[in-house]
Amino acid sequence: MARALLIVLDSVGIGGAPDADRYGDAGSDTVGHIAEACAAGRGDRPGLRAGPLRMPNLTALGLGLACEGATGRVPPGLAPDGPVRALWGHAVETAAGKDTPSGHWEIAGVPVREAWGHFPDTQPAFPAELTAALIERAGLPGILGDCHASGTAIIEALGAEHVRTGKPICYTSADSVFQIAAHEEAFGLERLYETCRIAREVCDPYRVGRVIARPFLGSAAEGFRRTSHRKDFSVAPPAGTLLDGLEAAGRAVVSVGKIGDIFAHRATGREIKPAGNAACLDAALDAFAGLPEGGFVFLNLVDFDTEHGHRRDVPGYAAELEAFDARLPEIQAVLKPGDLCVITADHGNDPTWTGTEHTREQVPVLAFGPGLTPRALGRRESFADMGASVAAHLGLPPLGAGQAW
């Protein structure tokens, strides 16, 4: 019986989706623009990296050709040198969102058919009755923010007032999110989580996809900094996912990174949530090495998105891509005959783009394992094709959406 490892490189899009113009994202291209910036010397940072984008292992798996399929061009430095060693293609999202739950749920076989609720880019951004209910139920002295904002910018602007008043910082973005930032010591980490649990209930009637706890530390004098104790409070998928199918079949499942949060901890098996891409990949490889036949490891690597995409940090994003690429031999080494590894993304977050939000993009589809014959997969009309293919590989019944390759 086979095993499978599904790796989501959070926000590593490869070119604007066919409907990107509806989102103001026509022309966005996370990987392509990073490669172009690095080739032009705009990806250099002393002590971090310099020169063209170097991803020899992903290039050998067909990443550059997947980019070409999505945009019509191979990004600088990503043309394969020799035969491609994987199945390669690109996928288009059918869900209306460009957010984390929409992308992951569709990958797992459940496209979001109804639109998420969003808050307007006004101040206040939140309905008065929502704010009043949260303040009353959580016993808060009030809230700060109540607007669209960059998470790092708003804690710098309001962190000192938050510590002084005890009012948490509440903000949103173009995604369907209600985010609450609070100081781990002055406000308390567990109190922040409990406030978010209440906010989750308060936000449900508004079809908000995620409530996110954004803890931070520091002071006005030394500056404030986010910690690794972020926690997402998501709604559950509206139908059975690949994970539910695995649970029903009695298969071993390991969820690494924020996968458990994304799927509201339903059918997510053993959850491991280290801090940072490197530690998450370590945990996934360790879990996969001991995984029984028929098992599944689902990994999200979020630092591309949170540390570099939203911060429009080209050198940091490039270095993160190169660091992952350097570890591909470790991934290949843990695969046994019959195993499948799929590498993809959930949306884009072009660090050369305007603003600080996600970008509506196509995503790479790279699949490999001992004994798999490399070939072009072309354009996949739904992210759900990946979940369908993993289900077929593991001998599960077909999912509700997607076509296996």
UniProtKB/Swiss-Prot annotation:
Entry GO terms, CC: cytosol
Enzyme class: isomerase
Predominant subcellular localization, coarse grouping: cytoplasm
One example GO MF annotation: manganese ion binding
Record's subcellular location: Cytoplasm
Keyword Signal: no
Residues that coordinate or bind Mn(2+) 2: 305, 310, 358
Sorted UniProt keywords: Cytoplasm, Isomerase, Manganese, Metal-binding
Sequence positions that bind Mn(2+) 1: 10, 346-347
Cofactor (UniProt): Mn(2+)
Stored InterPro entries: Alkaline_phosphatase_core_sf (IPR017850), DeoB (IPR010045), Metalloenzyme (IPR006124), Phosphopentomutase_DeoB_cap_sf (IPR024052)
Involved pathway(s): Carbohydrate degradation; 2-deoxy-D-ribose 1-phosphate degradation; D-glyceraldehyde 3-phosphate and acetaldehyde from 2-deoxy-alpha-D-ribose 1-phosphate: step 1/2
One of the protein's GO biological processes: 5-phosphoribose 1-diphosphate biosynthetic process
Known EC number: 5.4.2.7
Cofactor note: Binds 2 manganese ions.
Function in brief: Isomerase that catalyzes the conversion of deoxy-ribose 1-phosphate (dRib-1-P) and ribose 1-phosphate (Rib-1-P) to deoxy-ribose 5-phosphate (dRib-5-P) and ribose 5-phosphate (Rib-5-P), respectively.
Protein name: Phosphopentomutase
